Amino acid sequence: MELVGRIETRPVEGARDLDLFVKLPFRLPEQRPNRVPPLLTDEREFHDPKKNPQLTQCDVQRWVAWRDGKVVGRIMGIIQKSYNAAHGERTARFYNLDCVRDADVVHALIGATEQWARSKGMDRMIGPFGFSDKDPQGLQIEGFEHLPVIATPINPDWLPPMVEACG
């Protein structure tokens, strides 16, 4: 658990925390007007090691951010060991970054992931980037007036500058 300002980041531990993590995007206010939420069954399967073998082949850590007793964000850190070995890298990835409109929350979540990555010997972090290039990656930076298409990043327009400010 890490406390940054009023924001507390807690690692996801156990089924109850994972359920909260998976359902969090459905509870967040202030998302983009044309937002189409992911299918809950797809989200559950993505985070189920019985359905997604990447979860057993990578180092993965998830966090939920809290402020004043309320859930305000989530993020997942990934170390894709086989990719790093094949490319001679020590790169971590962040993924599933969803939160309320608050730069402090974004900073706390990315900071927790960065600290975890360093503790695992990583010297670089990229994201949003999932397990592979088959997962939606990156941030949408324009075209928010249009409905999203399948397998593309879906984020509010205020998120990219907040992520960029984290370095």
For each feature predicted by the language model, list its residue ranges.
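A short helix-loop-beta-strand connector motif used in the catalytic cores of GNAT acetyltransferases and
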Residues: D48-R67, G73
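Acyl-donor binding region in acyl/amide transferases
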Residues: A85-G167
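Short amphipathic alpha-helix that is part of the acyltransferase structural core
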Residues: E2-K50
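A short acidic/small-residue loop/turn micro-motif
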Residues: I79-K81
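Short aromatic-glycine motifs in intrinsically disordered, low-complexity regions
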Residues: M1-E2, A151
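A common structural microfeature
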Residues: L18, V60-R62, V72-R74, T91-F94
